[in-house]
Amino acid sequence: MKKRTREQTGLIPRSILRTFERFRKQLLPGAEMLVIQEFRISRYQVIVSVRCLITLIFVPLFINILSKSFLIRPGIEYLWNQNHNEIFLNSYQENRALHDLHQFEEKVYFDSFVTDFAPSSNVLLQKQSVEIAKNYNLESIEAISNLFADFLSFLSLSVVFLLLKPQIIILKAFLSESLYSLSDTTKSFLLILGTDLLVGFHSPRGWEVFLEWLLRHFGLPENSDFMSLFVATFPVFLDTVFKYWIFRSLNKISPSTVATYHNIIE
């Protein structure tokens, strides 16, 4: 039977070992040339990483904005208004429109008592109904346009990942090195900040707002039962993943960070 190779975890953190190794190299003959070479490599790594990060962010963003503004939205708007008699994408959108109209009707009814002269309520309701219909018609067009534009952005991001594989490897190495170079207290602070934002005590409300925005962004029905189930289960799943990652990976990479993290939360 073949023995399984396991990664040995020493008592000394790897960051200290890397620092000691660099210090040892600086004492060797030709250390000046070595320092210059390391500086050039570091500068090249920073330049490539910044370019790669900018490309990953702005290329899909520009494709989304340009395709949506000049191609997708005009086409969707023409097809929707010419070949579609409906205004709403789903019943939840229609209920929101009726709720808005009902609120306006109550406001007109209240104003008719507090003002001496009030225009005809039927005329106001008719104008408001037309305005609400226009707004929700535009919301439906916007939701369908978002679906196609975001799909194109995802495709463009996938193509960028395929074309920039070497640069992405350098970017990952640069980000890892930058993260490992932080102090244990700073890394623990960022870890606590991330976990509290995603799975903390006040995170359910944030997940509700995010899920509501996401459903409206794509014109999907806002099912309260689904939202409650998602908010009740997804943060728990994320919390389990975080704890497993801390125990399985971070404890090997930087045990001092894990120790500092536990001291802070205690």
UniProtKB/Swiss-Prot annotation:
It is a multi-pass membrane protein. Coiled coil: none annotated. The chain crosses the membrane at residues 46-66, 151-171, 226-246. It comes from the Eukaryota. Keywords: Antiport, Chloroplast, Hydrogen ion transport, Ion transport, Membrane, Plastid, Plastid inner membrane, Potassium, Potassium transport, Transmembrane, Transmembrane helix, Transport. It catalyses: K(+)(in) + H(+)(out) = K(+)(out) + H(+)(in). It is found in: Plastid, Chloroplast inner membrane. It holds the Pfam family CemA. Signal peptide: none annotated. One of its GO terms (cellular component) is chloroplast inner membrane. Its main location: plastid. GO terms for molecular function: antiporter activity; proton transmembrane transporter activity. One of its GO terms (biological process) is potassium ion transport. Contributes to K(+)/H(+) antiport activity by supporting proton efflux to control proton extrusion and homeostasis in chloroplasts in a light-dependent manner to modulate photosynthesis. Prevents excessive induction of non-photochemical quenching (NPQ) under continuous-light conditions. Indirectly promotes efficient inorganic carbon uptake into chloroplasts. Belongs to the CemA family. PANTHER family: CHLOROPLAST ENVELOPE MEMBRANE PROTEIN (PTHR33650:SF2), CHLOROPLAST ENVELOPE MEMBRANE PROTEIN-RELATED (PTHR33650). This is Potassium/proton antiporter CemA. It comes from Chlorella vulgaris. The lineage of its organism: Eukaryota, Viridiplantae, Chlorophyta, core chlorophytes, Trebouxiophyceae.
